[in-house]
């Protein structure tokens, strides 16, 4: 007897797709689908166009793995940035968050996963850019502490200074859930790893 819902396949498919977005529940997905499908179809078309453009143009920077629309991102190609510091982060979105603080003027390296790290390319970059310090900007967890130790061990022959952001960042919390003042203080109070 559920024929009404069965007759709305396209709408329910949209709800289902929106619900797959992280942090979007069924109710929020339903509200978005209703808004886009009925109340503001122009916005839906605009979003569709923006998604097509993003999918067509977004890529990973060949140097740091951050998001870019060219082979090398704006940060890596900016000659005014400090070459002596390399900030390692876990996700491309972390670069956005740290850049918004305007506290760091060095370079970045995004670790998508430890399995994907090309240590040969990273070592070449350390030499070419004359990196002296690696800053680990990871949320504090035991797994991330192990990751820092592993990276330090792999790169110890470079005699780098290894630091990590201070423990003002709550354990188990992602950067997007931390206010900018706390994150800025933690970043500026980083300690030797």
From Swiss-Prot:
Record has DNA damage as a keyword: yes
Biological process annotations from GO:
DNA recombination; DNA repair
Source organism's superkingdom?
Bacteria
What GO molecular function terms would the record report?
A: DNA binding; zinc ion binding
Q: A single Pfam family, by name?
A: RecR_HhH
Q: Which residues cross the membrane?
A: none
> Is Zinc-finger given among the entry's keywords?
yes
* C4-type zinc finger segments: 61-76
State the UniProt keywords alphabetically.
DNA damage, DNA recombination, DNA repair, Metal-binding, Zinc, Zinc-finger
CDD domains the record matches: TOPRIM_recR
- Where in this chain does the record put each Toprim domain? 84-170
Q: What does this protein do?
A: May play a role in DNA repair. It seems to be involved in an RecBC-independent recombinational process of DNA repair. It may act with RecF and RecO.
The record ties this protein, via HAMAP family, to: RecR
UniProt family annotation: Belongs to the RecR family.
Protein name (record): Recombination protein RecR
- Organism per entry: Helicobacter pylori (strain Shi470)
């Amino acid at each position: 007897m559920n024929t009404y819902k069965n007759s709305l396949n396209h709408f329910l498919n949209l709800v289902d797709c929106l619900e797959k977005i992280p942090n979007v529940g069924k109710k929020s997905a339903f509200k978005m689908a209703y808004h886009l499908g009925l109340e503001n179809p122009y916005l839906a078309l605009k979003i569709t166009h923006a998604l097509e453009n993003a999918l067509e143009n977004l890529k990973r920077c060949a140097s740091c793995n951050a998001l870019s629309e060219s082979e090398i991102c704006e940060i890596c190609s900016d000659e005014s940035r400090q070459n002596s510091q390399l900030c390692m982060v876990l996700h491309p979105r972390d670069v956005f968050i740290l850049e918004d603080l305007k506290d760091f003027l060095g370079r970045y390296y995004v670790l998508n996963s430890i399995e994907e790290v090309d240590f040969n390319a990273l070592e070449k970059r350390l030499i070419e850019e004359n990196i002296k310090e690696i800053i680990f900007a990871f949320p504090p967890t035991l797994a991330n502490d192990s990751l820092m130790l592993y990276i330090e061990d792999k790169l110890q022959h470079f005699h780098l200074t290894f630091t990590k952001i201070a423990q003002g960042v709550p354990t188990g919390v992602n950067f997007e859930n931390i206010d900018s003042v706390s994150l800025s203080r933690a970043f500026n109070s980083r300690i030797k790893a």
